[in-house]
């Protein structure tokens, strides 16, 4: 049997961490077993579904490297097939037309309150559909749920799950306007797409029981189900619309790498010999749903930052520059010259060692690709204003250095000598020198930075800083 998994998001909102992890686990499971990973857009909620959101989900998955196989299945385009299955179930006597109004159903529910029993709608039309004496008014189609039995399935994570049939309502599979419900569409699509394994959040367990009942009514074999524990926030609370994790596109905008985010999501529930850093190629080889635990995972921003720093450090300088350049050009509002790129490439290694995200790196490296006028942060401005006398003296000292001697070793010696003769702490000199040349109080080794920028640029920036 060839493994076929699927990711089936509802295009009513952007791809979030929980959905991305579900997609990742399904993708890894399929790739590990050399199977297929399919993508289906469950857009039956037409009022809230959006083509823009569909494209954003596709873009986010592509950015994460989760490429799907075959064409994307759009659920709403298969409505005729869903309706045909509902009609077949009615003809088989396994579903029926329910003419009860919404008010009548609500009245039944109201009367059952306080009994302590699960509310199960009792439709008077359940056994009358074959008489031919049916009212001429709107109806829904309900599936006849089994009675006096227990529905069981073996979940790949939680083990045996059992639900008594009296806890399952005669679920609506066709609405009064003739459109299929989510539960019907999902079961039909999973069957027709030949899905063999479904990996999704544990909040779907109730739906799974109903879907198994529906599949059995059609004499279909259900896929193997794996329900993974939900993701909670840093404090262990459930994520909600108000208390949600950022969408995948937000993590991208914050400067996180897709490799880091995938590694982060992988470790939310799955583990192998306590390995923290697992590349996607490694994950494909190692991935097994047997290694997924039953405990909920909590967001851990520090871990994500740690992973991102690792993956940034593992990239070549040219790869980092390719990622960094669009961010810098957007910040500066134009193309960056070859001369400035050359400066940046000489200093990028030291910058990467310090940066946590690409956005951090872009901010930290601006001084390499700017001209004399640079962005100077408030702390650096204050440092410059408090050190103008010494800055002027240091400027005079730096101006007297022969261009051939503008090397980091000689510059370090000059700075050391300057601090000694002025009875200044080296750290203080580095502070106001760094502030005037980079616009920041933190940077890589300032002597190395000065060598890369060149004497003329450094002198001009120090002159400009005196005007603050």
Swiss-Prot record:
<dbReference type="GO" id="GO:0006424">
    <property type="term" value="P:glutamyl-tRNA aminoacylation"/>
</dbReference>
<dbReference type="InterPro" id="IPR020751">
    <property type="entry name" value="aa-tRNA-synth_I_codon-bd_sub2"/>
</dbReference>
<comment type="function">
    <text>Catalyzes the attachment of glutamate to tRNA(Glu) in a two-step reaction: glutamate is first activated by ATP to form Glu-AMP and then transferred to the acceptor end of tRNA(Glu).</text>
</comment>
<dbReference type="GO" id="GO:0004818">
    <property type="term" value="F:glutamate-tRNA ligase activity"/>
</dbReference>
<dbReference type="InterPro" id="IPR049940">
    <property type="entry name" value="GluQ/Sye"/>
</dbReference>
<dbReference type="GO" id="GO:0008270">
    <property type="term" value="F:zinc ion binding"/>
</dbReference>
<dbReference type="GO" id="GO:0005829">
    <property type="term" value="C:cytosol"/>
</dbReference>
<feature type="binding site">
    <location>
        <position position="241"/>
    </location>
    <ligand>
        <name>ATP</name>
    </ligand>
</feature>
<dbReference type="InterPro" id="IPR033910">
    <property type="entry name" value="GluRS_core"/>
</dbReference>
<feature type="short sequence motif" description="'HIGH' region">
    <location>
        <begin position="9"/>
        <end position="19"/>
    </location>
</feature>
<keyword id="KW-0030">Aminoacyl-tRNA synthetase</keyword>
<dbReference type="InterPro" id="IPR000924">
    <property type="entry name" value="Glu/Gln-tRNA-synth"/>
</dbReference>
<keyword id="KW-0963">Cytoplasm</keyword>
<dbReference type="GO" id="GO:0005524">
    <property type="term" value="F:ATP binding"/>
</dbReference>
<dbReference type="InterPro" id="IPR004527">
    <property type="entry name" value="Glu-tRNA-ligase_bac/mito"/>
</dbReference>
<keyword id="KW-0648">Protein biosynthesis</keyword>
<dbReference type="InterPro" id="IPR008925">
    <property type="entry name" value="aa_tRNA-synth_I_cd-bd_sf"/>
</dbReference>
<dbReference type="Pfam" id="PF00749">
    <property type="entry name" value="tRNA-synt_1c"/>
</dbReference>
<dbReference type="GO" id="GO:0000049">
    <property type="term" value="F:tRNA binding"/>
</dbReference>
<comment type="subunit">
    <text>Monomer.</text>
</comment>
<keyword id="KW-0547">Nucleotide-binding</keyword>
<keyword id="KW-0067">ATP-binding</keyword>
<comment type="similarity">
    <text>Belongs to the class-I aminoacyl-tRNA synthetase family. Glutamate--tRNA ligase type 1 subfamily.</text>
</comment>
<dbReference type="Pfam" id="PF19269">
    <property type="entry name" value="Anticodon_2"/>
</dbReference>
<feature type="short sequence motif" description="'KMSKS' region">
    <location>
        <begin position="238"/>
        <end position="242"/>
    </location>
</feature>
<dbReference type="InterPro" id="IPR001412">
    <property type="entry name" value="aa-tRNA-synth_I_CS"/>
</dbReference>
<dbReference type="InterPro" id="IPR020058">
    <property type="entry name" value="Glu/Gln-tRNA-synth_Ib_cat-dom"/>
</dbReference>
<dbReference type="InterPro" id="IPR014729">
    <property type="entry name" value="Rossmann-like_a/b/a_fold"/>
</dbReference>
<protein>
    <recommendedName>
        <fullName>Glutamate--tRNA ligase 2</fullName>
        <ecNumber>6.1.1.17</ecNumber>
    </recommendedName>
</protein>
<keyword id="KW-0436">Ligase</keyword>
<dbReference type="InterPro" id="IPR045462">
    <property type="entry name" value="aa-tRNA-synth_I_cd-bd"/>
</dbReference>
């Amino acid at each position: 049997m060839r493994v076929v998994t699927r990711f089936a998001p509802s295009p009513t909102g952007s791809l979030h961490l929980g959905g991305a992890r579900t997609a990742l686990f399904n993708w890894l499971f399929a790739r590990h077993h050399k199977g297929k990973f399919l993508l289906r857009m469950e857009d039956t909620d037409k009022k809230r579904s959006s083509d823009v959101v569909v494209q954003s989900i596709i873009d986010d998955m592509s950015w994460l490297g989760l490429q799907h196989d075959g064409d994307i299945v759009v659920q709403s385009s298969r409505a005729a097939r869903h309706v045909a299955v509902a009609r077949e179930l009615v003809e088989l006597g396994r579903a029926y037309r329910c003419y009860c109004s919404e008010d009548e159903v609500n009245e039944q529910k109201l009367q059952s309150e306080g009994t302590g029993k699960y509310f199960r709608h009792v439709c008077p039309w359940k056994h009358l559909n074959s008489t031919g004496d049916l009212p001429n008014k709107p109806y829904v189609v309900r599936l006849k749920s089994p009675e006096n039995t227990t529905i069981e399935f073996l979940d790949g994570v939680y083990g045996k799950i059992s639900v008594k049939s009296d806890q399952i309502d005669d679920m609506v599979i066709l609405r009064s306007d003739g459109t299929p419900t989510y539960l019907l569409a999902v079961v039909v699509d999973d069957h027709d797409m030949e899905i063999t394994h479904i990996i999704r959040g544990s909040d779907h367990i109730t739906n799974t029981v109903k879907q198994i009942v529906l599949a059995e009514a059609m004499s279909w074999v259900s896929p193997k189900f794996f329900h993974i524990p939900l993701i909670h926030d840093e404090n262990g609370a459930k994520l909600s619309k108000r208390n949600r994790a950022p969408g995948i596109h937000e993590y991208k905008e914050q400067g996180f790498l897709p490799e880091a985010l995938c590694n982060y999501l992988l470790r939310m529930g799955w583990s192998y010999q306590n390995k923290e850093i697992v590349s996607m190629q490694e994950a494909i080889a190692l991935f097994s749903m047997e290694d997924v635990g039953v405990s909920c995972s909590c967001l851990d921003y520090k871990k994500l930052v740690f992973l991102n720093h690792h993956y940034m450090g593992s990239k070549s300088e040219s790869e980092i520059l390719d990622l960094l350049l669009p961010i810098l050009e957007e910040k500066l509002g134009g193309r960056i010259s070859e001369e400035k790129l050359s400066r940046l490439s000489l200093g990028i290694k030291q910058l990467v060692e310090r940066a946590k995200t690409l956005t951090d790196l872009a901010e930290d490296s601006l001084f390499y690709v700017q001209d004399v006028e640079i962005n100077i942060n408030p702390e650096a401005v204050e440092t410059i204003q408090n050190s103008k006398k010494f800055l002027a003296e240091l400027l005079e000292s730096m101006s007297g250095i022969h261009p051939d001697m503008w090397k980091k070793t000689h510059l370090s010696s000059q700075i050391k000598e300057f601090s000694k003769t002025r009875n200044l702490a080296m750290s203080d000199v580095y502070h106001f020198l760094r502030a005037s040349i980079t616009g920041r109080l933190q940077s890589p080794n300032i002597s190395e930075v000065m060598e890369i920028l060149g004497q003329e640029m450094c002198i001009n920036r120090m002159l400009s800083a005196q005007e603050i």
